[in-house]
């Protein structure tokens, strides 16, 4: 069976993954051996009228509540389409799901969407599949090899690890930031840039070295 990576991104009505409703969701199915996109989707859905939205969220993703009311899918319809599409993709081979800050948001958001729509088995990301988050990988890469990634500094002189900033500074700018499709393409480009085989090998050696030191300190 072939190995694939599913890059995904969601735009929502809130920054709270438990109470947010998805208004736009993109997935790219990429074959690992040649990084070719073999399938993709972008679904637009209507938020539930029982949920409050955050104005800030709409200001970020560029949607308006009047626009999202006209989207094709209901929240339940979106949950069904995501379940069907990801299940179909899983039948092609082994999948690795990747989202930027996915551990803290996108994976939880999607699973909560399935759960709140009474799907009895919302753990599709971790069953016969694996999860990946490019954000901590980028942080580790930059820590061990600062020359790998260019990062901007905020007003406090701290490094910024926002997706749009990293993509813009490293040669593959996002056409329209905070749209699910363009952010997903940017995530794919960023991930492929920092996960080259030689860089991963060096990072693995550094990680193992730190682990061995920790084991010696604690007598493990």
Residue ranges with predicted function:
Residues 15-17, 139, 189:
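Conserved protein kinase catalytic core
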Residues 169, 181, 185-220:
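Acidic two-metal-ion nuclease catalytic site recognized across multiple nuclease folds
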Residues 10-14, 136, 186:
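Short, glycine/acidic-enriched loop or turn micro-motifs at the edges of active sites
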Residues 115-128:
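A short alpha->loop->secondary-structure connector
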Residues 2-117, 157-168, 172, 178:
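Conserved non-catalytic scaffold segment of RNase H-like nuclease domains
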Residues 20, 120, 144:
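Catalytic phosphate/metal-binding cores of nucleic-acid and nucleotide-processing enzymes, i.e., regions
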Residues 131-154:
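Short alpha-helix plus adjacent loop in nuclease-associated cores
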């Amino acid at each position: 069976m072939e190995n694939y990576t599913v890059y995904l991104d969601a735009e929502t009505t809130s920054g709270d993954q438990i109470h947010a409703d998805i208004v736009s969701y993109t997935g790219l199915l990429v074959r690992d051996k040649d990084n070719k996109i073999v399938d993709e989707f972008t679904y637009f859905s209507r938020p539930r009228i029982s949920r409050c939205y955050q104005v800030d969220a709409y200001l970020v993703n560029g949607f308006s509540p009047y626009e999202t009311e006209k989207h094709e899918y209901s929240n339940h319809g979106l949950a069904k389409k995501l379940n069907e599409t990801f299940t179909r993709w899983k039948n092609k081979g082994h999948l690795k799901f990747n989202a930027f800050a996915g551990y803290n948001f996108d994976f939880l958001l999607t699973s909560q969407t399935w759960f709140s729509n009474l799907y009895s088995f919302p753990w599709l990301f971790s069953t016969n599949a694996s999860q990946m988050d490019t954000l901590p990988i980028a942080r580790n890469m930059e820590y061990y090899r600062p020359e790998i990634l260019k990062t901007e500094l905020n007003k406090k002189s701290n490094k910024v690890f926002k997706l749009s900033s990293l993509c813009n500074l490293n040669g593959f700018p996002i056409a329209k930031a905070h749209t699910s499709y363009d952010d997903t393409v940017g995530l794919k480009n960023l991930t492929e840039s920092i996960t080259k085989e030689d860089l991963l090998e060096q990072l693995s050696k550094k990680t193992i070295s730190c682990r061995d030191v920790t084991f010696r300190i604690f007598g493990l």
